[in-house]
């Protein structure tokens, strides 16, 4: 690795990670500091060349130095962890019951960050027992295979009359977000983290009548990388089973 003469965030030999976002810096979202939703956003390995090459150049403002002692394996997982850090901060989860729909890597990390941010209780759901076992290994005690038991029934047993107040859609399928909308408490928030291959058909009447809020979550910003590194370094978020 080589660094330009003006670079101060790292030096040759340092272990680093970097955000893959390429942003314009000139559009309104960028000017507001919301460059994760840049009007001209490109992502390396998608709309721009990736990093599977011997040498490539990145701007220093995308670089985050890894702390001493953090393995490169964990360093490679900071990117998805930052997705979890960002999504879990899109609404206030402290003291609230939470359901995370989808127990893949991102859903697992969203659930872990919700716990870290003070959620009262977190239930994670999926159709895969393997993914749910991984969630339990990561410290998410309450899991549900929705092919074996309905969410409504399980949530009632787990949360009682209090219900749950925050849902995270991390599966990317219509049945998932519809289930959240139909079982969450009125006046609650649903954060959409997944990328849907097909737009779901949702009841706007139900949304309005129950005064639900659908909140988008797009990738991350620099501070989310820093939060992810901090929580992983302190053992608050467990990457080892992943």
Summary of predicted features, one role per range:
Residues 153-161, 197-242:
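C-terminal substrate-binding/catalytic core of Rossmann-like NAD(P)-dependent dehydrogenases/reductases
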Residues 1-28, 67-69:
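Glycine-rich beta-strand-centered segment in the early N-terminal region that forms part
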Residues 188-189:
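Glycine-centered, small-residue-biased loops immediately flanking beta-strands
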Residues 184-185:
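Helix-to-beta-strand junctions that scaffold the AdoMet/dcAdoMet cofactor pocket
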């Amino acid at each position: 690795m080589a660094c330009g003469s003006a670079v101060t965030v790292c030096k040759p030999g340092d272990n680093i990670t970097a955000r893959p976002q390429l942003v314009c810096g000139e559009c309104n979202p960028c000017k507001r500091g919301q460059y994760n939703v840049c009007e001209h956003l490109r992502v390396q390995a998608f709309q721009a060349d990736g990093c599977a090459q011997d040498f490539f150049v990145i701007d220093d403002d995308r670089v985050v130095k890894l702390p001493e002692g953090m393995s490169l394996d964990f360093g490679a997982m900071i990117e998805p962890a930052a997705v979890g850090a960002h999504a879990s901060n899109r609404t206030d989860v402290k003291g609230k019951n939470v359901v995370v729909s989808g127990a893949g890597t991102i859903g697992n990390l969203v659930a872990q960050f919700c716990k870290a941010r003070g959620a009262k209780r977190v239930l994670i759901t999926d159709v895969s027992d393997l993914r749910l076992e991984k969630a339990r290994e990561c410290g998410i005690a309450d899991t549900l295979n929705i092919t074996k038991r309905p969410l409504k029934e399980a949530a009632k047993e787990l949360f009682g009359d209090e219900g749950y107040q925050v849902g995270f859609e991390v599966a990317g399928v219509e049945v998932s977000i519809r289930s959240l909308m139909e079982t969450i408490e009125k006046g609650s928030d649903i954060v959409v983290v997944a990328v849907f291959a097909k737009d779901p058909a949702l009841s706007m009447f139900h949304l309005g009548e129950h005064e639900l809020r659908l909140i988008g979550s797009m990738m991350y910003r620099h501070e989310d990388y820093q939060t992810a590194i901090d929580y992983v370094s302190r053992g608050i978020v467990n990457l080892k089973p992943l």
